């Protein structure tokens, strides 16, 4: 199976240690990669592609969101593909960056009455799918992406994040 070269950076926030985040992220994304290869026939390069995960706070992600998306507010996760990829096409050697905000993640998890780690898992899967060109702007795209998220999370032993909950509007690219 294709492994990922995951680079972790904890910038701000009350996150677990980098070692804990590395272990959790590796487990989550290995399952996600295996799913995409088996179920979506997603090709991967022979050499492990690099992925940057940045764990930060609401203030930092708000600034990034304002600069890159013209939305001056914090969000839970942002994804920045290194190269444009559409689902099913070969990604480059660098997948891109996923940035997660601690306070927003913590607040949303509490609102949904879900464990912090479970919501973090969902956000990492969500952000990772964005790096492969999946999106949720149009209803049909959102339905496809949410279906993939639900199936991947099921492989990780987690319930459907959209089942009984209203869709979180802040899940953004």
Curated annotation (Swiss-Prot):
Q: Is Metal-binding set as a keyword in this record?
A: yes
Top enzyme category? hydrolase
What keywords does the record list, in alphabetical order? Cytoplasm, Endonuclease, Hydrolase, Metal-binding, Nuclease, Ribosome biogenesis, rRNA processing, Zinc
Gene (name only): ybeY
Q: How is the cofactor bound?
A: Binds 1 zinc ion.
Q: Which molecular function GO terms apply here?
A: metalloendopeptidase activity; RNA endonuclease activity; zinc ion binding
Which residues are recorded as binding Zn(2+)?
Answer: 126, 130, 136
UniProt organism field:
Sinorhizobium fredii (strain NBRC 101917 / NGR234)
Q: Please state what the protein is called.
A: Endoribonuclease YbeY
The record lists the lineage as: Bacteria, Pseudomonadati, Pseudomonadota, Alphaproteobacteria, Hyphomicrobiales
């Amino acid at each position: 199976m294709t492994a990922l070269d995951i680079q972790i950076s904890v910038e701000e926030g009350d996150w677990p240690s980098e070692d804990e985040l590395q272990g959790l992220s590796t487990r989550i994304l290995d399952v996600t990669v295996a799913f995409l290869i088996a179920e979506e026939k997603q090709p991967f390069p022979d050499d492990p592609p690099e992925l940057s995960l940045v764990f930060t706070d609401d203030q930092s992600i708000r600034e990034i969101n304002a600069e890159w998306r013209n939305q001056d507010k914090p969000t839970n996760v942002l994804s920045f593909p290194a190269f444009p990829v559409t689902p099913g096409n070969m990604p480059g050697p660098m997948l891109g960056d996923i940035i997660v905000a601690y306070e927003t993640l913590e607040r949303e998890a509490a609102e949904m009455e879900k464990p912090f780690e479970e919501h973090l898992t969902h956000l990492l899967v969500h952000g990772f799918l964005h790096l492969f060109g999946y999106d949720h702007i149009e209803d049909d795209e959102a339905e496809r992406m949410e279906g993939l998220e639900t199936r991947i999370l099921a492989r990780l032993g987690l319930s459907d994040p959209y089942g009984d909950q209203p869709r979180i509007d802040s899940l953004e690219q």
